[in-house]
């Protein structure tokens, strides 16, 4: 299943084509839209927002039953819900959290493969690069930063990411072995100590799902 904003339509097409080329039997696209989402929260009554439609629950169960891999592409405007009633947002989040609990558990326990990626959305790009000469330049600059972060500019991006993931895993393994009781952060104006519970677990950039597949 692919969750992606309508603004990223062309990227969605590329992802769907590649998924089928790699052997996917079905690619379900769950479109998101900042404008439609905002209008819903501004105008829908509370009794509608704190209830999750049965079709959404049925879709979740369908995805779980078929052990569907999940890819979330995030590009939303960080300020899309500015000014929206906080009680409405809270009620909706609580309802979704309860109804989608099976999916959350399956994801957190890596019973299915999942990942989250970023795409350059216009409103997001304008907030990150407010001094860009044009909207197009702002989006290009944000894509550039995303590509750098994801090693896209490397000669072999996949190998570069695998090497990065291996480094992260080695760090996580070390932290799990040490089992520090706390983390102490210091900087100008900062002196923060965060306690850690016994038997805490550090994770990195990769995992193995219940079917023994790496992701």
Which ranges hold each PLM region?
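Active-site bordering "gate/hinge" segments
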Residues: 2-215
């Amino acid at each position: 299943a692919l969750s992606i904003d309508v603004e990223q339509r062309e990227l969605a097409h590329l992802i769907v084509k590649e998924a089928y080329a790699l052997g996917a039997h079905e690619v379900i696209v769950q479109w998101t839209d900042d404008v439609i989402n905002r209008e819903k929260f501004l105008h829908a009554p509370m009794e509608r927002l704190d209830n999750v439609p049965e079709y959404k629950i049925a879709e979740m169960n369908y995805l779980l039953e078929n052990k569907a891999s999940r890819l979330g592409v995030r590009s939303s405007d960080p300020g899309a819900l500015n000014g929206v009633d906080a009680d409405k947002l809270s009620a909706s989040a609580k309802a979704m959290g309860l109804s989608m609990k099976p999916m959350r558990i399956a994801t957190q326990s890596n019973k299915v493969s999942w990942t989250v990626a970023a795409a350059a959305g216009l409103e997001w790009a304008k907030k990150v690069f407010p001094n860009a000469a044009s909207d197009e330049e702002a989006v290009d600059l944000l894509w550039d930063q995303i590509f750098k972060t994801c090693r896209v500019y490397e000669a072999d991006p996949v190998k570069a990411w695998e090497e990065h993931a291996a480094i992260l895993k080695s760090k996580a393994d070390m932290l799990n072995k040490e089992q520090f009781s706390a983390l102490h952060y210091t900087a100008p104006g900062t002196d923060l100590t965060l306690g850690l519970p016994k038997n805490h677990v550090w994770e990195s950039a990769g995992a193995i799902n219940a079917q023994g597949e790496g992701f």
